[in-house]
Regions:
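An alpha-beta-alpha
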Residues: 119, 123-134, 139-164
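N-terminal beta-loop-helix "entrance" segment that forms/cooperates
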Residues: 14-35
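Short, small-residue-enriched loops and turns at beta-alpha junctions
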Residues: 26, 56-57, 160-164
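Short helix-capping segments at alpha-helix termini
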Residues: 9-14, 175-183
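Short glycine/threonine-rich loop-to-helix capping motif typified by GTGT followed
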Residues: 163-173
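N-terminal phosphate-binding or glycine-rich loops at protein starts, especially the Walker A/P-loop
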Residues: 1-21
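Conserved small/polar residues in nucleotide/adenosyl-binding loops
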Residues: 186-188
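N-terminal glycine-rich phosphate/adenylate-binding segment common to multiple enzyme folds
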Residues: 28-124
């Protein structure tokens, strides 16, 4: 993180840095993986320069990334991808992945079920998708396509297996697509 702030400072970027902690370091020094001061700083400034945060696998505190997404309604994860080096394994790659960040299995409703003497014999998780959130993320993708001169939106789903949970996403995708003449919807 220090390298990034040094470069931005050298470029004359007009930032006043408000350094806050999160993750394992914050847990050890402040007793919370995501201290109130960090959340207050994010809410106040509306900006975060965040590096990777460790999330314990299997046990421990809830993912800070998931908490931040839900706390600040960071519902759209936008990942542009383009071929940079010609002659590589893949040529002419130019796509943008827009992933919904707060519903589905990201709701993180997980539990153990006891069987006999084993309190963790069965692990299960549940997800949910709301019509409103499905509509919002699909609309975001279509608006992104319009603003960036894209010709199509590909909706990736599992409605063949998760007929209700993923089906509502596909249904809303089709409804929103009907409003965008000139853009095609492909679903897989």
């Amino acid at each position: 993180m220090a390298s990034v702030t040094t470069v931005l400072d050298a470029l004359g970027a007009p930032f006043v840095w408000d350094h806050q902690s999160a993750g394992m370091g914050a847990l050890e020094s402040q007793g919370s993986a995501l201290p109130d001061a960090t959340l207050e700083s994010i809410a106040r400034t509306g900006l975060v320069l965040k590096g990777p945060l460790t999330t314990p696998v299997g046990k421990g505190f809830r993912s800070i990334n998931v908490t931040l997404r839900q706390q600040f309604d960071l519902y759209a994860n936008v990942r542009p991808t383009q071929t940079i080096v010609p002659g590589g394994r893949y040529e002419n790659v130019d796509l943008v992945v827009i992933r919904e960040n707060v519903e589905g299995l990201y709701a993180a409703m997980e539990h153990y079920m006891r069987v006999g003497d084993d309190p963790e014999a069965v692990a299960y998780g549940a997800g949910f998708n709301t019509r409103a959130e499905c509509n919002r993320i699909v609309r975001f993708a279509f608006e992104y396509a319009v603003k960036n001169g894209r010709k199509k939106v590909t909706l990736v789903h599992k409605a063949n297996i998760l007929k209700i949970l993923s089906g509502i996403f596909l249904h809303e995708g089709r409804r929103v697509a009907a409003e965008y003449e000139g853009l095609s919807l492909i679903h897989i």
